[in-house]
């Protein structure tokens, strides 16, 4: 599971000229990618990490506020560009596997008291945001399993 987090002062998602999700910050835009090996345990662990990261103004977390999160599914986070000029999406989990896991991620954040808005799963979306900082952090479940260096 990969999540690109951006601290925002506001963000919104539009599908077919309809705003389907928006937040006023400070908050986080979370672009969420899932792969074949992700499980409900992976989702729960990363939801806890996202909720507790102290990257908002004043070194606070979403759980402290609570501050809102706009969660947007993004399979392209698992694009493989090692060969040729067209990315391969084979490392991204298919929709029937990733949609329930994405919904579980959203539910896990809400269970922690965090207000969450979402895009529309599988739709072509326009995401608008105003970065605050800018602060952008990549959270990768594979990296969390590795030992820390130095």
Swiss-Prot record:
- An example Gene Ontology CC term for this record: cytoplasm
One function term, GO molecular function aspect: Ser(Gly)-tRNA(Ala) hydrolase activity
Name the reaction it catalyses: glycyl-tRNA(Ala) + H2O = tRNA(Ala) + glycine + H(+); a D-aminoacyl-tRNA + H2O = a tRNA + a D-alpha-amino acid + H(+)
Q: Which domain of life is it from?
A: Bacteria
Q: According to the UniProt entry, what is the EC number of this protein?
A: 3.1.1.96
Q: What GO biological process terms does the UniProt entry carry, in alphabetical order?
A: D-amino acid catabolic process
Q: Which UniProt keywords apply?
A: Cytoplasm, Hydrolase, RNA-binding, tRNA-binding
Q: Please name the top-level EC class of this enzyme.
A: hydrolase
Taking the first listed entry, what is the main subcellular location of this protein, grouped into a coarse class? cytoplasm
Quote the subunit structure annotation.
Homodimer.
Family the entry assigns: Belongs to the DTD family.
Its biological purpose: An aminoacyl-tRNA editing enzyme that deacylates mischarged D-aminoacyl-tRNAs. Also deacylates mischarged glycyl-tRNA(Ala), protecting cells against glycine mischarging by AlaRS. Acts via tRNA-based rather than protein-based catalysis; rejects L-amino acids rather than detecting D-amino acids in the active site. By recycling D-aminoacyl-tRNA to D-amino acids and free tRNA molecules, this enzyme counteracts the toxicity associated with the formation of D-aminoacyl-tRNA entities in vivo and helps enforce protein L-homochirality.
Written domain comment of the UniProt record:
A Gly-cisPro motif from one monomer fits into the active site of the other monomer to allow specific chiral rejection of L-amino acids.
Record's protein name: D-aminoacyl-tRNA deacylase
Organism encoding this protein: Kocuria rhizophila (strain ATCC 9341 / DSM 348 / NBRC 103217 / DC2201)
For this protein's source organism, the top of the classification is:
Bacteria, Bacillati, Actinomycetota, Actinomycetes, Micrococcales
């Amino acid at each position: 599971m990969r999540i690109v987090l951006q601290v925002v002062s506001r963000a919104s998602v539009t599908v077919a000229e309809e705003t389907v999700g928006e937040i006023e910050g400070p908050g986080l835009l979370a672009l969420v990618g899932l792969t074949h090996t992700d499980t409900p345990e992976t989702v729960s662990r990363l939801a806890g990490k996202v909720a507790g990261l102290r990257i908002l103004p004043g070194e606070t977390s979403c759980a402290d506020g609570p501050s809102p999160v706009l969660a947007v599914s993004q399979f392209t986070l698992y694009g493989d560009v090692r060969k040729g000029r067209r990315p391969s999406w084979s490392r991204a989990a298919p929709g029937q596997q990733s949609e329930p896991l994405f919904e579980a991620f959203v539910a896990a954040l809400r269970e922690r008291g965090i207000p969450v808005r979402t895009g529309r799963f599988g739709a072509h979306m326009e995401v608008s945001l105003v970065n605050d900082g800018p602060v952008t952090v990549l959270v990768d479940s594979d990296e969390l399993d590795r030992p820390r260096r130095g």
